[in-house]
């Protein structure tokens, strides 16, 4: 028989007592009552906060949104196939946060800031809360610096400033995303960080955008946040806030940032789905009562910061898709009232061959005028009015058989101005080129050029200036002002190109 040694037993007991962990961990735990359609009802979680992250037994994360008397309504940020009735749920005590930092540049991430581009994890230790307060009144400064889009029609007539919120609105397939991508491409030498948020889009469309940006070297200063159509509604709802959070990091570091939300109609639809499943009372068009706040708190985070705050800026270009041009629907009117102007794209203009298909008559920039460069502001002052008058006359002239000479001339000039503003995709123009093109049209220097040759004239003028009048481009790009000397150089160049074209046409 094995002899029992008391000293050995006492040594084991002493060691176990010494190793005993006295710390007590208290966790707020609940039980799943029902789960389905991306929503879980949880019993317990007495101390849960609104918007708190909760963790399910299978590792799925959720957000507590409805705090009711006897249960908590949570949205799932994942498929949640492993969640069953009776599963335990743990409150994390944290609000949703995403990783931020320089390492995010050039990456494609999901709504939680996790890499989905197959390039491994993002090497950053910094995080920011997804829901952050917008800068206050004292922390802001009025918009005064231009944000060049590279699209002549916008920079000349509907200018956007750094820190502005400018809505891009139009039916499907009217070139809304194309304007946003062109704007990103034009920031290559502007020292601006871009964030492109894709909400509820086809994965193939997002892959196409990534490829375009990579080919043209724009991915180096861009972060892409993607919540595709296949993702749960909660992730589609969160994506724009994630994009704003990533841009905010750079804004508070004193950098200029640009955020594109493509598009907020799909985010509103995802929020409506979540709210209806959580049994919140529906309002107009079945959207919940706080859908306005959902967008206003997002877009108010865009700002031009004061000197004391580091002079950073966040420019927001939200995109809204309309149905059959109806800008008076609920979500479009909401976002129009929040933003500082809108660029309206018309499917009729798009189908008639005018691209970008901007309807100048109802497009407006409420604060961008203060940020426009003097060179183009001086020249383009009458451009918007002339185009609006041309549209009216064009409609009237369909019914009038004989028109007087001045009306005929106005119609002819309007046609040429229209042609001048045509611009192919992925070919943003520098300021000097825009100034030259607008000057030629507004001053009537191309009235002798046939309408079908105006696009060729625009291209040839740009090439002529680059090769023969480089001093004009240098002066406009550096000084941003049109001096009498520069105007004389430009006039000579336009006359030269026009005479060459007219001679070759004859």
From Swiss-Prot:
Key words, A-Z: ATP synthesis, ATP-binding, CF(1), Hydrogen ion transport, Ion transport, Membrane, Nucleotide-binding, Thylakoid, Translocase, Transport
Record field: catalytic activity: ATP + H2O + 4 H(+)(in) = ADP + phosphate + 5 H(+)(out)
GO cellular component labels: plasma membrane-derived thylakoid membrane; proton-transporting ATP synthase complex
Entries under Pfam families matching the protein: ATP-synt_ab, ATP-synt_ab_C, ATP-synt_ab_N
Membrane topology: Peripheral membrane protein
Enzyme Commission numbers on file: 7.1.2.2
Annotated site location: Required for activity: 363
GO MF annotation terms: ADP binding; ATP binding; proton-transporting ATP synthase activity, rotational mechanism
InterPro entries given in the database record: ATP_synth_asu-like_sf, ATP_synth_asu_C, ATP_synth_asu_C_sf, ATP_synth_F1_a_nt-bd_dom, ATP_synth_F1_asu, ATPase_a/bsu_AS, ATPase_F1/V1/A1_a/bsu_N, ATPase_F1/V1/A1_a/bsu_N_sf
Enzyme category, top tier: translocase
Family (UniProt): Belongs to the ATPase alpha/beta chains family.
Protein name: ATP synthase subunit alpha
Organism: Synechococcus sp. (strain CC9605)
